Amino acid sequence: MKIVEVKHPLVKHKLGLMRENDISTKRFRELASEVGSLLTYEATADLATEKVTIDGWCGPVEVDQIKGKKITVVPILRAGLGMMEGVLENVPSARISVVGIYRDEETLEPVPYFQKLVSNIEERMALVVDPMLATGGSMIATIDLLKKAGCHSIKVLVLVAAPEGIAALEKAHPDIELYTASIDKGLNEQGYIMPGLGDAGDKIFGTK
């Protein structure tokens, strides 16, 4: 599995601001979107382009345009929605597919409860977005769902990842790519990433 920890100074600076304990909902939401945008920039660096001739202000001009697979952005509900706007700033024509996952309280296994995928997803590259990759359960379940629907070109974008989640994801789906702003130390006894960001969903939606 290709694993990319984006070390750009802007990414590190913005993520550092997100770690502040007393950060406002507005600021956290803005930064989640901004870092999501920067991760998208990195994740799409290998997109193929082709030469196209267009009508420029002074006549025909040859330009580069992206070719190949189109993109679908896949936010995992609910926290993934906080990164979606930033992703779409870079790929505004991308279609949106939505997946909802919850954890069964008895088995602790992830259970899909909602999915709305674009109709031609097998022809698209999926950018799956979720702020945190902790145990990896929700992400693995989402990718299982996407592959079952015929999508096999998949890149994962997360703000923070735990080594435990990375290992689980690599074991389940070694063919995908992971882009993260930080690989943190690991999980605590409650399953939170340390130092992490706390509950990203609560901070994005103001429900903490």
Swiss-Prot record:
Allosterically activated by GTP. Transmembrane segments: none annotated. It comes from the Bacteria. It holds the Pfam family UPRTase. Uracil binds at I193, G198, D199, A200. One of its GO terms (molecular function) is magnesium ion binding. Binds 1 Mg(2+) ion per subunit. The magnesium is bound as Mg-PRPP. It catalyses: UMP + diphosphate = 5-phospho-alpha-D-ribose 1-diphosphate + uracil. Belongs to the UPRTase family. PANTHER family: ADENINE PHOSPHORIBOSYLTRANSFERASE, URACIL PHOSPHORIBOSYLTRANSFERASE, CHLOROPLASTIC. Catalyzes the conversion of uracil and 5-phospho-alpha-D-ribose 1-diphosphate (PRPP) to UMP and diphosphate. This is Uracil phosphoribosyltransferase. It comes from Pectobacterium carotovorum subsp. carotovorum (strain PC1).
